[in-house]
Amino acid sequence: LLPETVSLFGNYLKDQIMMPDKSEAVKPSHLFYQSRTRRPLATHAEGIYIWDESGRRVIDGSSGAMVVNIGHSNPNVLAAMKAQMDKATFIYRLHFENEPAEELARQLVRRMPEGMDKVFFVSGGSEAVESAIKLARQWAVATKQASRWKVISRFPSYHGATFGALSVTGYDALTAPFTPMVPDMPKIGAPTAYLDRDNLTYEDRGLKYADQLEEKTLAEGADSVLAFIMEPIGGASTGALVAPDSYYGRIREICDKYGILLIHDEVMSGAGRTGKYLGGDHWNCRPDIIAMSKGLGAGYVPLGAMIASDRIVQPVLSAGGFAHGYTYAGNPLACAAGLAVLEEIDRLDLLTNATVMGERLKQGLLDLAEIFPFIGDVRGKGLLLAAEFVADKNTMAPLPAGLNAYQHIVEIAYKRGLIIYSRRSRGGVEGDHFLICPPMIITAEEVDLILSIIKDSLEELAQMLDLPVNR
């Protein structure tokens, strides 16, 4: 690898660090993931809390990796899983259909935009995105549009770790090591209108960013462009980025004009986290294909889904079938758990709670931005929220990368009993931000506790890095 590639990837690995207390004896481990750094050993979890082997309780303020939408150890989900385990844990879809998969598909379709009525189950977000790209390509071939193969995406963005998903990911720290092996798909700028200092209105900025799709399509050759993939509300790569309202409708117009399929990556924003079941529902979006995971299984099982319109699926099936599949697609145990998660979202009215508690949490973060002027932006919807650090609020200049503020804030908050999630919003190299995305079951008292810990953590960060504070 080139030195700069090693440096970028090394910084990404540092993002993952959550160190146990150095005084603890650490047992040898044969596991490895992103790095050799060890984590504390969790013993159990319930609600919004996780306990380690020392008995210490921490608040899961990021829902794991924005996964545990309905909280840990929900008894109704566990009971549904146990009931299914007593029947069958694996049924291969080429041999039999199974009722949990059929019912979960029916319930998902009820929550989708009109016309999105075909479901393909997978085990995770990368698989969901991979499936979406492959379905789009097979649709083009089946409808005699084989010249269409390019999938335009945004920079920065993150769509998964498999090679197809990486090809549409715009995050150098993750893509650089694999550059020779991964197709270089076209990119346009993410709609970071909050950074712009121009004479345009906010909505005109949204149109400006959306129009990049038309410009890129024409530059690439419209007949070669297959699809455009985007997160309706950004995830970790952009820190809960929300585009101006004008952006979403214009994107659909451009896709329709040039026959481009619109793929929504709802892996992080879907399953209710933003206060709507889909992030795109805030703008009545009409994508052609949707990728979901994370909150769909809510941490109880590995589960994801690709949902598409019959207009896309039928030509593929008529041309010989979808040349794609996974061993655990439609697994009855996973689908029984996913169905129970949906039922809990409805029973507990968690879409409403995500909206109300999200407003409380967001207002609290905005109040903290008045005290800590190095918070330049607070954004997101529902309980998918982020705060970005800056050196200057007027220019939105980022903090110096060498301060590593995004790493320090995670370490400080964890020491105080709160898990948060951090990255860099501007291509992974600067623009420190932290995400705060607690489970959707959170109460007002728990929101206030989180805000209190964040305030204390920001105080310590300011003192550590000599950042300004308004007393």
Regions found by a protein language model. Name each.
Residues 5-17:
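Short, Lys/Arg-enriched N-terminal segments with co-localized hydrophobic residues
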